């Protein structure tokens, strides 16, 4: 019977080592690596979740704080509207007031029936639309309202959020500060009561006669996208007109744009009905 070939001692030792040590070691290391990777991923997800939760809490606090700041600024504007409304009502009622010669000289009429201011002189712009025939225009009223020009100027200068201060009458007369060339900017047959910055303050839309905010609209005075705080001016139960303070969307975005939003977010200004009132342009970097 032939003898079985002898295996070299080294091969026998290697096989024994492979079976008893190396393979179990590789298996254990594989398991440990798997556990490490799983644990590391779990820890990473926990850390990301914690950071996200922390960021959202910080953002919530920042938004609430910023909201209170903006709310206080807007309430200040509402208070200014109330002061301006009272001044306009008094100016309309005081027929004893005599406008100076400069105020008379800075007004002119077009052949089409527009009564308008033609020079700045540090005063408000004035525009009586041709939608009211010239013979029915209360031009004394238009000149009498020059009495409130200093207040309009003070309101505009006191609050950087305010882009313009104005009064619109029931018969399509507009007085607005700062001055601009109304004849070039406004439609000559402009029917002012048809605009939202007028009718939203009327008895139908605002029966409580308080200060209300418009939705965002394109300003006919050329100041871009705008929202206005407006309030009615009554003589008894007759609506003489509407006063307003304009705030541009760009100015509101400048207020909200400083808010640091994580996760590549950005700030929006949302109205009470959840309508977006102001948002940054796409790719604006905000």
Labelled PLM ranges:
Residues 2-49, 53:
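Extreme N-terminal signal-anchor transmembrane helix of membrane signaling/transducer proteins, especially
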Residues 38-85, 89:
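Juxtamembrane membrane-water interface segments immediately C-terminal to a transmembrane helix
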Residues 71, 85, 89, 152-160, ...:
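Short regulatory alpha-helical segment in sensory/regulatory domains of signaling proteins that mediates
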Residues 90-144:
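Alpha-helical transmembrane helix bundles of large polytopic membrane transport and channel proteins
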Residues 126-129, 173-180, 274-280:
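Amphipathic coiled-coil signal-relay and dimerization helices
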Residues 145-157, 242-286:
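Solvent-exposed, extracytoplasmic
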Residues 156-246, 254:
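Extracytoplasmic/periplasmic ligand-binding sensor regions of membrane-associated signaling proteins
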């Amino acid at each position: 019977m032939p003898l079985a070939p002898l295996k070299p001692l080294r091969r026998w030792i290697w096989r024994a080592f492979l079976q008893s040590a190396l393979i179990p070691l590789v298996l254990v290391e594989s398991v440990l690596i798997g556990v490490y990777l799983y644990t590391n991923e779990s820890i990473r997800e926990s850390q990301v979740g914690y950071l996200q939760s922390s960021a959202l809490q910080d953002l919530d606090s920042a938004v609430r704080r910023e909201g209170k700041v903006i709310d206080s600024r807007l309430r200040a504007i509402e208070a200014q509207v109330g002061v301006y409304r009272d001044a306009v009502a008094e100016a309309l009622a005081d027929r004893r007031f005599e406008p100076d010669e400069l105020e008379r000289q800075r007004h002119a009429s077009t052949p089409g029936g527009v009564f308008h201011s033609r020079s700045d002189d540090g005063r408000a712009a004035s525009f009586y639309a041709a939608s009211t025939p010239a013979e029915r225009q209360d031009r004394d009223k238009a000149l009498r309202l020059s009495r409130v020009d200093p207040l309009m100027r003070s309101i505009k200068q006191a609050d950087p959020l305010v882009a313009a201060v104005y009064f619109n009458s029931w018969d399509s007369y507009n007085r607005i500060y700062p001055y601009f060339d109304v004849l070039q900017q406004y439609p000559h047959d402009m029917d002012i009561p048809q605009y939202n910055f007028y009718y939203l303050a009327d008895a139908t839309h605002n029966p409580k006669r308080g200060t209300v905010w418009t939705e965002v609209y394109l300003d006919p005075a050329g100041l871009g996208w705008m929202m206005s705080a407006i309030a009615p001016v009554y003589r008894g139960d007759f609506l003489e007109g509407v006063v307003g303070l304009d705030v541009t969307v760009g100015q509101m975005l400048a207020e909200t744009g400083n808010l640091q939003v994580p996760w590549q977010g950005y700030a929006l200004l949302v109205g009470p009905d959840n309508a977006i009132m102001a948002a940054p342009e796409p790719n604006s970097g905000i």
